[in-house]
Curated annotation (Swiss-Prot):
Species annotation: Archaeoglobus fulgidus (strain ATCC 49558 / DSM 4304 / JCM 9628 / NBRC 100126 / VC-16)
Protein name, per record: Uncharacterized protein AF_0255
Record-stated family: To A.fulgidus AF_1348 and AF_1363.
Length: 87
């Protein structure tokens, strides 16, 4: 038996994944972080994005739960890894 709350969460989860995957910059950020993680400085240097593009998209990925920052390093969450694997 599937609870209504689980269906809502599933739909919201898929909508978030869809929104993230529709942005080439967000996909680029997730791919660059990869499974090893990177510091903000490493990531910014590698991607060569404007300050606005970098901050706006990285902040969105963090707020939506695809990326987390631990000990000065950006890492993918389980949702971030799912997005990475989806390509």
């Amino acid at each position: 038996m599937v609870l209504m709350g689980e269906k809502v969460r599933d739909r919201e989860h898929h909508e978030r994944l869809f929104k993230a995957s529709m942005s080439p910059i967000r996909r680029q950020i997730v791919a660059a972080i990869g499974v090893q993680g990177k510091t903000r400085e490493e990531l910014k240097k590698e991607l060569e994005l404007s300050d606005f593009q970098f901050k706006f998209n990285l902040d969105w990925l963090i707020r939506e739960g695809f990326v987390k920052e631990e000990d000065g390093k950006l890492k993918l969450t389980d949702d971030g890894i799912e997005l990475l694997e989806a390509g």
